[in-house]
Amino acid sequence: MSPSRPGFSCSWLPYLLVLPQLAITAIFFLWPAGEALWYSVQTLDPFGLSSEFVGLSNFIQLFQDEYYLASFYTTLIFSALVAGIGLIVSLFLAAMVNYVLRGSRLYQTLLILPYAVAPAVAAVLWIFLFDPGLGLITHALAKLGYSWNHAQNSGQAMFLVVLASVWKQISYNFLFFLAALQSIPKSLVEAAAIDGAGPVRRFFNLVLPLISPVSFFLLVVNLVYAFFDTFPVIDAATGGGPVQATTTLIYKIYREGFAGLDLSSSAAQSVILMLLVIGLTVIQFRFVERKVRYQ
């Protein structure tokens, strides 16, 4: 006879317990999302005092704007680089710490420190290092015959914001990867080694499948981070330049809505960005998750 499941003495208590979370979701997500959807089909004056229904006109104008399409492409490239490089570097560092016995605590502490730095501060730190006139890295590159000026070179500007964004997120990824690696039974790794599997083969055939749930979770988190949370890095490092080379969708929304006071266009861009992130998340859960092995 199976034991009975513990229940609540009052039928309304479960609903009361989830009410705060539902209220937060409604106030900070559903309400703003609903307003953005409504404003996206309106044309508003700069102060939002008068409006006129225009249907899909705002969306049509966006997809006819070459600068918006360029920011769309920039966002995809930027997000892929931040998520891909961040996950690979973090996994490599976690694997190194996991196999190092001496000084592993020191390595963990040093690798966790960047997570305590605000994104804007992280961008400023890298700006000082890559400053065309005073930066230490810039002077080192100059001695090698390479000229650096991210304010004029779009490729260098993209490299700078990707580097700062990846550096800021490495600590978060590192903690999860290290915990996942340390949870793998050593007996499995030792058995694979006895069977003749080398370090590389053990990693790809044994370790990587076992940590795939964590890898999948971090893939989703890093893509969302690249889409939204890198705004302070871009704003502080390049301001979206040069020539909008580092203007992502989230930064263009800010520029249109807060700097240009084009509320209708920024609302339409917000809706498109929301649908894009939802679509990418659905694709990941439908196709990528199939290769994830849950224990």
From Swiss-Prot:
Domain ABC transmembrane type-1 span(s) in chain numbering: 72-284
Membrane topology term: Multi-pass membrane protein
Entry keyword annotation includes Cell inner membrane: yes
Coiled-coil segments: none
Cell compartments where the protein resides: Cell inner membrane
Domain of life, source organism: Bacteria
Pfam families membership: BPD_transp_1
Residue ranges, Periplasmic side: 33-80, 131-157, 229-262
Record carries keyword Membrane: yes
Transmembrane segments: 12-32, 81-101, 110-130, 158-178, 208-228, 263-283
Function: Part of the ABC transporter complex UgpBAEC involved in sn-glycerol-3-phosphate (G3P) import. Probably responsible for the translocation of the substrate across the membrane.
Quaternary structure, from the entry: The complex is composed of two ATP-binding proteins (UgpC), two transmembrane proteins (UgpA and UgpE) and a solute-binding protein (UgpB).
Similarity comment: family membership: Belongs to the binding-protein-dependent transport system permease family. UgpAE subfamily.
Protein name: sn-glycerol-3-phosphate transport system permease protein UgpA
Organismal lineage: Bacteria, Pseudomonadati, Pseudomonadota, Gammaproteobacteria, Enterobacterales
Gene transcribed to yield this protein: ugpA
